[in-house]
């Protein structure tokens, strides 16, 4: 086989592997069907904007920063053990505070379900590659930190199966979802961060019959 033909064949194989490995982020979100009493904690940027469109609900709390999502979600799961807490995180955010994985491994919460959408890029700042585009394996790091059953899925069929099982069974889950870098604009946020947080607080206060903020919040 000539070098040119070999080169074309390798390119075709690479394309097939890439298509099989990755799928659209927005498409993936539609497969996460959470219960009416569940708490959703969602990373910032496109993750929040897409989720607000796919699943608008008072029980969503949206982040305004990076790196602190796992600690906050773990805290929510600990103080609300009777409710399922679903964290939608990203590779860039998890990489910013890897030490959170050791805490997660040491103090697991059976009602916490974590999905890390890994597009191997910092999309919000221009698509610069994260270290997961090279050799870093977030699920492997989580396993080494004591997070049992942490795994990576790379196609829609595997994701649908993993998401369905995670949301239907007891026990903490940690699923890294390989998705393609999104193209085009994301849906515009319907609420400001302050409005969304206020709505979430009112929702928890009403459903838990507890006061969280003693001052008036709007």
Residue ranges and their predicted role:
Residues 22, 54-56, 169-218:
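Glycine/aspartate-rich loop-and-adjacent alpha/beta segment that forms the canonical ThDP
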Residues 1-16:
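N-terminal low-complexity segments that are often proline-rich with Ser/Thr-Pro
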């Amino acid at each position: 086989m000539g070098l040119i033909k070999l080169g074309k064949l390798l390119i075709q194989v690479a394309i097939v592997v890439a298509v099989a490995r990755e799928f659209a982020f927005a498409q993936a979100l539609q497969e996460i069907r959470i219960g009416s009493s569940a708490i959703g904690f969602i990373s910032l940027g496109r993750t929040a904007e897409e989720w607000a469109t796919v699943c608008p609900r008072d029980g969503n709390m949206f982040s305004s920063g990076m790196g602190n999502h796992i600690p906050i979600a773990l805290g929510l799961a600990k103080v609300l053990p009777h409710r399922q807490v679903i964290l939608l995180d990203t590779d860039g955010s998890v990489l910013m505070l890897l030490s959170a994985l050791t805490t997660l491994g040491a103090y697991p919460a059976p009602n916490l379900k974590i999905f890390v959408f890994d597009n191997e890029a910092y999309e919000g700042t221009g698509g610069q590659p994260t270290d997961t585009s090279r050799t870093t394996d977030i699920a492997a790091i989580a396993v080494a930190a004591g997070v049992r059953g942490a795994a990576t899925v790379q196609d829609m069929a595997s994701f649908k199966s993993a998401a369905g099982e995670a949301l239907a069974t007891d026990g903490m889950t940690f699923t890294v979802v390989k998705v393609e870098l999104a193209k085009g604009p994301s849906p515009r946020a319907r609420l400001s961060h302050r409005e969304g947080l206020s709505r979430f607080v009112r929702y928890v206060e009403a459903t838990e019959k507890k006061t969280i903020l003693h001052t008036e919040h709007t």
